[in-house]
Amino acid sequence: MACCRCDSSPGDYSGALLILFISFVFFYITSLSPQGNTYVHHFDSSSVKTQYVGISTNGDG
């Protein structure tokens, strides 16, 4: 049981880090793109925020 609990803790961190990494990569790619980088960045930021909140709530509950 302790092992399972221990495994769950890093799992949540991994998910958050993965989302942050994906968002960073997406932002980097969009930044390289000359067309509508600001709009996409704003949309991506909002989407990531929603996903992060959803995962945070899911992991907590």
Curated annotation (Swiss-Prot):
It is a single-pass type II membrane protein. Residues 34-61 are lumenal. One of its GO terms (biological process) is transport of virus in host, cell to cell. Keywords: Host endoplasmic reticulum, Host membrane, Membrane, Signal-anchor, Transmembrane, Transmembrane helix, Transport, Viral movement protein. GO terms for cellular component: host cell endoplasmic reticulum membrane; membrane. The keyword Transmembrane helix applies. InterPro entries: MNSV_P7B (IPR009575). It is found in: Host endoplasmic reticulum membrane. Its main location: host cell. This is Double gene block protein 2. It comes from Melon necrotic spot virus.
